């Protein structure tokens, strides 16, 4: 299997870097959007199919491992391929490379669902579409996914982000782009970690940050311009330097659950660029608000 295809090549711009001094996760998803569209277009499942046949490939699940940082000015490229061909969808895989060093910085497993563009119901891939996709199959050596227990409900979750979907968030498929989901989850993370003491003031004074190393993103609903959105978050695990948070995004008008994000990260020493143990006071505050 040799179906790897370059689907993105670019650079990290200064305005894409967050307060942790590296490429913010939402802009990884902007690149992922480019990569997925490039691969789907090569498979005959891109925007042209949406216009001609009324069919879309919608992302329903992403498993992302952030392995190495990308910082201001770093040059990067993405290679993409097909891991699995399913009756009504595909599992795409992507590797994000630091072009200068050749190192893999991020791995992504992305499940897309083939649906009717208007009614959002499943549509089987045609035999021809399946054959083309099989031709892009690749061997995959990305990190294995771990499924962890999650809270059954939202008791103990805190409001962590709230806004309204804007018209300019819509992508070439007519859907709200994933990067905008992740921008909201990033804002939610700031409020969720501040609840146990990792505040902006603390991070500036102590030269500490929050560095994400894993996402498990699930998208089950649809957002449209004008929809009111709320994210609620909970801390579900705390270690010596690591934390795991669960974020739940809902449409406030309909109460529909739109997406969930399981986010794993570490307390980052901004100068050493290494994980740093949580101070005892912060760890105790974190344990006091754990939701299990």
Protein language model features and the residues they cover:
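Catalytic strand-loop segment that frames the active site of acyl-thioester-processing enzymes
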Residues: 1-38, 42, 139-201
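Short secondary-structure boundary/capping segments within folded domains
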Residues: 30-31, 49, 67-70
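Structured core of small recognition/catalytic domains
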Residues: 164-261
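Sequence-level motif detector for i,i+2 pairs with an aromatic at +2
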Residues: 2-7, 54, 61, 156-160, ...
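Catalytic adenosine-cofactor/nucleotide-binding cores of aminoacyl-tRNA synthetases and other
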Residues: 46
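Small beta-barrel nucleic-acid-binding modules, principally OB-folds
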Residues: 54-72, 207-222
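Gly/Ser-enriched beta-turn/beta-hairpin loop segments
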Residues: 50-52, 203-204
